[in-house]
Amino acid sequence: MIKEYKSIQEVAGPLMLINGVEGVKFDELGEIELSNGEIRRCKVLEVNGDTALVQLFESSTGINLAESKVRFLGKSLDFGVSPDILGRVFSGMGRPIDGGPEIIPDKRLDINGAPINPAARDYPAEFIQTGVSAIDGLNTLVRGQKLPIFSGSGLPHANLAVQIARQAKVRGTDSKFAVVFAAVGITFEDAEFFISDFKATGAIDRSVVFVNLANDPAVERVSTPRMALTAAEYLAFEQDMHVLVIITDITNYAEALREVSAAKKEVPGRRGYPGYLYTDLATMYERAGKMKGHEGSITMIPILTMPEDDKTHPIPDLTGYITEGQIILSRELYKKDIQPPIDVLPSLSRLKDKGIGKGKTREDHADTMNQLFAAYSRGKDAKELMAILGESALSEIDLMYAKFADEFEKEYVSQGFRTDRTIEQTLEIGWKLLSMLPKSELKRIRDEYFEKYMPKE
């Protein structure tokens, strides 16, 4: 039996205090019935004796303390799953917003899920092709990996996100592939861009999209990534699909967490974020991976904008501790019209060595990757020297490297947001660029690969 309480003590912003409650649990959902019959939803943040602190999903305007009633539903926030969720667009709270019919769920799953038991994890080892050379060739994404994209305000991370969602595929397997895309705290314009691009390119057919707008409540923003991960877990571990989860923007998520924490008057941590920000992010990121005995997998690409392009800001800093690398977008490359502006030198995929090589990409992948990194790094150094001392101060070989760095950015990194390159095309472009340098400089490439793959003049 569901009890109703008319003992609302206080309302402060999005928070409400209720006295005299019994059997109420943390994270439990509730309904507030206003005097005019309107229903608003809430969830329990804290229980102390017979007093419950709840947070409203909607505005607290119009709540009359004496006449409003509260009832608790005995369950936490959940999402109804079935194979029909593919091809659909949902709100941040899991309601269809694409004009289609309601989903008839096979079951309802708690959105908080559970991180994968470390003993049950399988090591990521299979290549995922994104069609983006700077990722596939140099910072390879591996199935089951967590690889964030660190962007800055005004950089085209939204375009890169939809490009990866549209192009990503698992090669050489009959396994089904799906994308779960969660847009957190975005504008109407961005929401329209994401949804129209998914529909125009047909990517929507293999995708589940969750959209939380900037004017939606902060508590909904905190729930949206977990809705997406619940859908991903169902598709991966019950439907045996390989799922790529893209969440943009984690910064908006953390801001919402800070807002909720401030409303609860919690002691703030670094820069006002709650002290449990690291733990909270880990409960999301660690839901990605592969499990022994399961065909499916969850690969995650969280995207975040670094405030003031600061890599030491708590959000990118803590994200870097939990995830397996990072892809960094560069404002300098963006100004040169390099699209996507991925700065490959500070970028890193810690699991890339496990997903490349013979039988996965190609036997020469590791050698060309190492040589391209080394040559581009030296080319950047040569260009810095040229800017200080002038071109005449450089040796002939340094001039070659400086030219290589320019061509590398134009030909390899820059490909636009509509070009889908196979790994073979990416490797061929790499070999073509390396042919600009004399063989004596290519010390990281084995002779047999040089003879086999170097383009003949």
UniProtKB/Swiss-Prot annotation:
It holds the Pfam family ATP-synt_VA_C. GO terms for biological process: proton motive force-driven plasma membrane ATP synthesis. GO terms for molecular function: ATP binding; proton-transporting ATP synthase activity, rotational mechanism. The keyword Aminoacyl-tRNA synthetase does not apply. PANTHER family: V-TYPE PROTON ATPASE SUBUNIT B. Produces ATP from ADP in the presence of a proton gradient across the membrane. The V-type beta chain is a regulatory subunit. This is V-type ATP synthase beta chain. The gene is atpB.
